[in-house]
Swiss-Prot record:
The protein's name: Nucleoprotein
Region called RNA packaging and organization of the helical nucleocapsid, residue ranges: 1-375
Keywords recorded for this protein, A-Z: Capsid protein, Helical capsid protein, Host cytoplasm, Host nucleus, Host-virus interaction, Phosphoprotein, Ribonucleoprotein, RNA-binding, Viral nucleoprotein, Virion
Residue ranges of the region described as Ntail: 404-525
Transmembrane segments: none
Organism encoding this protein: Measles virus (strain Edmonston-AIK-C vaccine)
InterPro entries: Paramyx_ncap
Motif (Nuclear export signal): 425-440
């Protein structure tokens, strides 16, 4: 049996182990397409700001092709470094594309104000064609979908600080799109707006340079459909993280946005570890969880073997991502979701609509949290040096806290209900007026006589015998009553019974000194 268990553990490790790079064959390369990336050819701030302005307009042009749009985005993403060309060449290793760098300098002879650097060759016309300044219709389209503030005509500046603020504002909006461009593009707008508000409050971005929704949709769609662009963005994030010492302000902002990008699409795996294993509830000892716990252990080892690209496996379309889906450990995932819903309010909006979701183990997780509330782990208490008296105090406080939390979360919801009091007079009852009022009083008096003589079991028959059959009860229901006499009869019967009961309560209340008054507290008790 021991040999079988060792073989099983070895099998599980090798099953999820990534293939080892070996063999005589070379790297497999696909059919590449060329991407032209414009970069500044000098260190002038005017050149960079003008290039940024032209690229933003170019991306807003709906007629731009996909590879050209990718090149423009890569050019903007690399503008914050001192040498964009060196950065692109260093971090780019894509088997699907071939990047061509074009240095851009200022020019007074072109409509775009820029030209491609060359030795003795006039490239103004080619630059105008690239930046869509060759015809007025395309120029007008390039302005569509730009900034929300229409008073901003251009973003050309000569001040390095102002350029960094404008560039950082645009880059923040682009990088935030990567967080949900692949995993949840339909619900991305709300989270992107929250990130924008956060960075606006922190003065990291300038609110006036908020880009229009259509421009952001174009960029988000391109990020979602172009793997090469996502590879470049992930490689740039990893390169920034590996940089020692202090980083530029824009680089630090990119690292901050990375906290929303990292582990995108891996929520099931991460939350199962957080709520299913790290909470260390005794339910982990169930035999049903034994196999899935072994699977999770193998996946955690595989995650570590993948290295620094593991948190980005979904954005990088790594085929190994399917092993980390919740379908590989459905029972443990369902249990962890139940634990998470009870522990964190933010888990309440999570979508559990999966075919492998097991409600029984979900409820198991909920019950484990509820019944374990206030208990102190003996192992953890011994490690922290907590005495038995302190543990009892913590348990008592935690129990009261949990009860308060439950009462606030699922407390009784009281409706707007009015109660009939024993001391309420006839004048305070709803009046119908005229003949109807007299008929109701007469019927109610006869109902009291019938109640005294025959008891409550036969009082309803006496009330039904004196029911006015042809009189509508309310002006709002008059048309309905005239169309259906039976409905009118039933409505009148119900109202008369209610008023008769009110009269009986009045008589019973007159025999006692203190009338019974009903309120919400009596009902809850």
């Amino acid at each position: 049996m021991a040999t079988l268990l060792r073989s099983l553990a070895l099998f599980k490790r090798n099953k999820d182990k990534p293939p080892i790079t070996s063999g005589s064959g070379g790297a497999i390369r696909g059919i590449k397409h060329i991407i032209i990336v414009p970069i500044p050819g000098d260190s002038s701030i005017t050149t960079r700001s003008r290039l940024l302005d032209r690229l933003v307009r170019l991306i807003g042009n709906p007629d731009v092709s996909g590879p050209k749009l990718t090149g423009a985005l890569i050019g903007i993403l690399s503008l914050f470094v001192e040498s964009p060309g060196q950065l692109i060449q260093r971090i780019t290793d894509d088997p699907d594309v071939s990047i061509r760098l074009l240095e851009v300098v200022q020019s007074d002879q072109s409509q775009s104000g820029l030209t491609f650097a060359s030795r003795g060759t006039n490239m103004e016309d080619e630059a105008d064609k690239y930046f869509s300044h060759d015809d007025p219709i395309s120029s007008d389209q390039s302005r569509f979908g730009w900034f929300e503030n229409k008073e901003i005509s251009d973003i050309e500046v000569q001040d390095p600080e102002g350029f960094n603020m404008i560039l950082g504002t645009i880059l923040a909006q682009i990088w935030v799109l990567l967080a949900k461009a692949v995993t949840a593009p339909d619900t991305a707008a709300d989270s992107e707006l929250r990130r924008w508000i956060k960075y606006t409050q922190q003065r990291r971005v300038v609110g006036e340079f908020r880009l229009e929704r259509k421009w952001l949709d174009v960029v988000r769609n391109r990020i979602a459909e172009d793997l090469s662009l996502r590879r470049f963005m992930v490689a740039l994030i990893l390169d920034i993280k590996r940089t020692p010492g202090n980083k530029p302000r824009i680089a630090e902002m990119i690292c901050d946005i990375d906290t929303y990008i990292v582990e995108a699409g891996l929520a099931s795996f991460i939350l199962t570890i957080k709520f299913g294993i790290e909470t260390m509830y005794p339910a982990l000892g169930l035999h049903e969880f034994a196999g899935e716990l072994s699977t999770l252990e193998s996946l955690m080892n595989l995650y570590q073997q993948m290295g620094e690209t593991a948190p980005y496996m979904v954005n990088l379309e790594n085929s190994i991502q399917n092993k980390f889906s919740a379908g590989s450990y459905p029972l443990l995932w369902s249990y962890a979701m139940g634990v998470g819903v009870e522990l964190e309010n933010s888990m309440g909006g999570l979508n559990f609509g999966r075919s492998y979701f097991d409600p029984a183990y979900f409820r198991l997780g909920q019950e484990m949290v509820r019944r374990s509330a206030g208990k102190v782990s003996s192992t953890l208490a011994s490690e922290l040096g907590i005495t038995a008296e302190d543990a009892r105090l913590v348990s008592e406080i935690a129990m009261h806290t949990t009860e308060d939390k439950i009462s606030r979360a699922v407390g009784p919801r009281q409706a707007q209900v009015s109660f009939l009091h024993g001391d309420q007079s006839e004048n305070e009852l709803p009046r119908l007026g005229g003949k109807e009022d007299r008929r109701v009083k007469q019927s109610r008096g006869e109902a009291r006589e019938s109640y005294r003589e025959t008891g409550p079991s036969r009082a309803s028959d006496a009330r039904a015998a004196h029911l006015p059959t042809g009189t509508p009860l309310d002006i709002d229901t008059a048309s309905e009553s005239s169309q259906d006499p039976q409905d009118s009869r039933r409505s009148a019967d119900a109202l008369l019974r209610l008023q008769a009961m009110a009269g009986i309560s009045e008589e019973q209340g007159s025999d006692t000194d203190t009338p019974i008054v009903y309120n919400d507290r009596n009902l809850l008790d």
